[in-house]
Curated annotation (Swiss-Prot):
This is Prefoldin subunit 1. The lineage of its organism: Eukaryota, Fungi, Dikarya, Ascomycota, Saccharomycotina. GO terms for cellular component: cytoplasm; prefoldin complex. InterPro entries: PFD_beta-like (IPR002777), Prefoldin (IPR009053). The keyword Transcription does not apply. Present with 721 molecules/cell in log phase SD medium. GO terms for molecular function: protein folding chaperone; unfolded protein binding. Keywords: Acetylation, Chaperone, Cytoplasm.
Amino acid sequence: MSQIAQEMTVSLRNARTQLDMVNQQLAYLDRQEKLAELTKKELESYPTDKVWRSCGKSFILQDKSKYVNDLSHDETVLLDQRKTLKIKKNYLETTVEKTIDNLKALMKN
């Protein structure tokens, strides 16, 4: 009986660790989405057709429309990643809840 409880405790600890990592990744995606959105808004307010884009330690001259399209694509990728992470988060939350319930039931017996 104690072997099962130990295994469940390890499983619970692992699920909580993974859940924390998923929450951190979701927070990072939030920041990236906001950055892309704000950059896109800022670029759309510029009257010029060409803008300088950061590329590592240097800059390249690029069409504003191309840069805005790249940012829109990045936002789409971020939304897909967010969807996947939310599914994983839901799974991990369910796993944590069920493991806790099972541990409680095991301790009652």
